[in-house]
């Protein structure tokens, strides 16, 4: 779908969700940031673009798994880890970032990340906030958001800027303590 609503504030929605995307919590193992959540977002956006997902219901299916693995291989080619994170990790944990939600068939699993098998058996689908879904219906805004994720979450330049900001924050804290 490439519909644009005439009286919808796309700029405001885009600004809100880019801020939320920058706040995505990502694991860091041996100084390497795990990119599974941003990669899952790209796979979902690609599914919308390609017509695989026509409603705000994303089922953990074979197409999504294959697209996710293809993108993981692309964005983790210099990784110290030989195998990319299983799709169950970001599919489950992205719900903690506030704009991705899972609809369960049964009670929610407690404790650690459920397996892919458990997710397929117990989660009906995942979905975005309604406003994000509306934004993603516009081809222009969908591409802008995809480009933003790649630039800020999946490239070295994005991480170098974040590392520099963290370093400046540490220096400022040190100077204030002195």
Regions found by a protein language model. Name each.
Residues 1-178:
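Intrinsically disordered, charged low-complexity linkers and terminal tails
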